[in-house]
Amino acid sequence: MNRQEQIKFIEDNYPAYTNHHSKRRVRHDFFNNIQTELQAYLLGFYVSDGNINEKRKTFRIHLQERDSELVYLYKDVISPDARVFSVAPHEVTGRNGAKVQASGSFGVDICSTILCRDLVNLGFGYSKTYSENHLPKIDKSLIRHFIRGYFDGDGSIMWWYQKADPKWKKNERIRSAVSICSKTNTILLDIQEFLKRHDIKSSICFANRDQMYQMSIPKSQLKKLYNLFYEDSYFYLKRKYKKFNHYVNTEETQLIAEFRNAQGMSASNSNNSPTSVEHPTK
């Protein structure tokens, strides 16, 4: 099913209705039976970057303003009448007590006891961040869409420019990798096993600085991961897709030229002492 066909399928098979608690229409059974790419993707994104409130029985997605497209997707598909909210840019305390400026954010709250119950039954309940989560028991053809959703929430595309090193006869180059993070390693181990079945290599380590586990997929595997994620797929974070597509399908010489232009470097300056500059894109 294409994008519109999936949305029509949801509208026909998961009716939105009100109840005595609220006059807002909600597709309370949206996560009860995962049958489409759309449901699997939104479930994966929720697992990495959403939450449910046990007391209020409220499902929440709260993202940076630049990713508001996903907030509206949750709203339009699950609860067309739900209210969205925004938070203005503000100062927060970052790593080592440093004050940093947080960007504006955007979110949606959906009240539904049934929706929250189904997420708990799927294994992604009220304390999922620190729980030993696993890939959900859904149709195998939908797992890649769940993982893409998880990646859009807690994954990063990283690339490094590395200067030439005449001593070791190494030319300047672009190095890149994809990382996916989690507070526990169980879901990453499941993802790793799934990727292995698709001939995609990865590694998992514990990042002490961030106190979380990190899966890394090296540059040599990114084309295969890109195809697994996006081939015949209709739901994804556009910003990440554009970055991923650019890094995977652009010649390395062009990426090097783009880096030089961005840094105001000439070709001769880029061949000085070896160094690397990291550019993560979450």
List each language-model region with its residue ranges.
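Internal intein/HINT superfamily modules and their associated LAGLIDADG
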Residues: M1-K282
